[in-house]
């Protein structure tokens, strides 16, 4: 009986402490609008080659693509580097992702081993891939599953 009481108390306390993701920035609060903006951005930039330090259609890196997308589509100013982007907003669980959230990956070592994209919908994200340029990828892909680091809501 005592064990049951302790177990019930522990379960109630655990339920009260559940982390709830914060609401998105007001400019990202309408998922339909965000998805449309991300689709338009992908259509405009699809296939743009990867270029470290780039922020134009002649070449763009992952954090540059995030900066340009958030600025041009949602009027949001983000830091330029992936490491800085990984510290803004609030960290959220992967199962709480909403369109417009940032997804981060550890694809190598050191500061240059980080990668960032923007969550779209249906477990997909848009990003500037080093091998294929700007594209849409699935978080279900084994590579991205293995290297997933964190998600952040801005």
Curated annotation (Swiss-Prot):
InterPro entries the record matches: Murein_DD/LD_carboxypeptidase, NLP_P60_dom, Papain-like_cys_pep_sf
Domain of life: Bacteria
Keyword Membrane: yes
Lipidation (S-diacylglycerol cysteine): 16
A cellular-component GO term for this protein: plasma membrane
Family matches, as PROSITE patterns: NLPC_P60, PROKAR_LIPOPROTEIN
GO molecular function terms noted in the UniProt entry: cysteine-type peptidase activity; endopeptidase activity
Keyword list, A-Z: Cell membrane, Hydrolase, Lipoprotein, Membrane, Palmitate, Protease, Signal, Thiol protease
Membrane topology: Lipid-anchor
E.C. number(s) listed in UniProt: 3.4.-.-
Localization per Swiss-Prot or TrEMBL: Cell membrane
Similarity comment: family membership: Belongs to the peptidase C40 family.
Name of protein: Probable endopeptidase NlpC
Organism for this UniProt entry: Escherichia coli (strain K12)
Origin organism lineage: Bacteria, Pseudomonadati, Pseudomonadota, Gammaproteobacteria, Enterobacterales
Gene coding for it: nlpC
